[in-house]
Curated annotation (Swiss-Prot):
This is Transcriptional regulator MraZ. It is found in: Cytoplasm, Nucleoid. Keywords: Cytoplasm, DNA-binding, Repeat, Transcription, Transcription regulation. Forms oligomers.
Length: 143
């Protein structure tokens, strides 16, 4: 499970150092792809395979599935952390997420999200008021 928020920097070669606590789960390989709200999703290879299998068994006649799958898979890149725990984020994905030097790497349960630091801060500010309301809708009776 991925938890917490970290603030690594992107180097000039498009490499980002993963938080140490995330590396063990990602050392066997990972997939980076477009996420929602202009962030990037990083999945351990096993989780990405599970998602792929789920999408593969869905009916190809569903237009929404075709549309989503095209974007999700065509933007995906596989990688593995190097000895320093760095991954290389391909230029098209850096552009999509608006990544500059300062990034935020968030644990999001089964995935990691990579955000541009300014974009993450703006997202947090926009969600602050609705957070309490969403908990009632998303987690009724759980918390």
């Amino acid at each position: 499970m991925f938890l917490g928020s970290h603030t690594p920097r992107l180097d000039d070669k498009g490499r980002l150092t993963l938080p140490a606590k995330f590396r063990d789960e990602l050392e066997g390989g990972l997939v980076i792809t477009k996420g929602q709200e202009r962030c990037l999703y990083v999945f351990p290879m096993a989780e990405f395979t599970r998602i792929s299998e789920s999408l593969r068994t869905a009916p190809v006649t569903a237009k929404a599935l075709r549309d989503y799958s095209r974007v999700f898979f065509s933007s995906a890149a596989d990688d593995a952390p190097d000895r320093q725990g760095r991954i290389t984020i391909p230029a098209p994905l850096r552009t999509y997420a608006g990544l500059t030097r300062d990034c935020v790497v968030n644990g999001a349960n089964t995935r990691v999200e990579i955000w541009d630091a300014q974009r993450w801060q703006a997202y947090l500010e926009s969600q602050e008021e609705s957070f309490a309301e969403l908990s009632e809708e998303v987690l009724p009776g759980v918390i």
